[in-house]
Amino acid sequence: MVRSVLHDRDLLSYAPFSHWLEYPIMASLTAKGCTEHCTICGGSAFAGRNLSHRQQPAYRPPEQLAQDMRRIGALSRGPVFLLGDLRQAGMEYARRFFRAVQGYQGPVIIEFFRPADRAYMEELAAALPNYFAEFSPESHDPRVRRASGKTYTNAGIEETIAACLETGVRRFDLFFMIGLPEQTPESALETVEYCRTLLTRFD
């Protein structure tokens, strides 16, 4: 994108969304492909096998990922969004990344594909003190989540929120959806009540 902007001397035409200049978020891919089997995702392991003929994810070397972040941080005041859960390739991959990125002070958005415990969040926060977190359980209802390919519990979601808040997360985004497999109107409305419970507990 940077080359194209310089070549054409035109930044606005390459802006990824309206008002991007006010919030110049940039992304860095941790991997091509995925280990997860989320039924609604076009980038799932199933989709990778059947659409891209990719049998397993190809992970960016963590040192290169850290280098990308530093380069992006030098160009933009906005956050860098690390697309993909750093733990997909295992904890050693995540720790190599944390060592390589140590000292980076810019805003970073990380995402979880499954719950994270306090120990992991302490390692992450030590390396990335200015971090934002995103987690998409999609439903409060474990039955609906299982039908969408997510097998963790509500306790796991709540442990993740607590661990992030206790380690200084700047913002925690939790995403829920409607129109999911096995989801009823009643279940969707119960998700709203679950959100109220979370706000009462963690706000």
Model-identified regions with their sequence ranges:
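Catalytic cores of alpha/beta
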Residues: 182-196
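Glycine-rich beta-alpha loop elements in corrinoid/cobalamin-binding modules
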Residues: 1-4
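Metabolite-binding pocket within alpha/beta catalytic cores that recognizes anionic/polar moieties
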Residues: 175
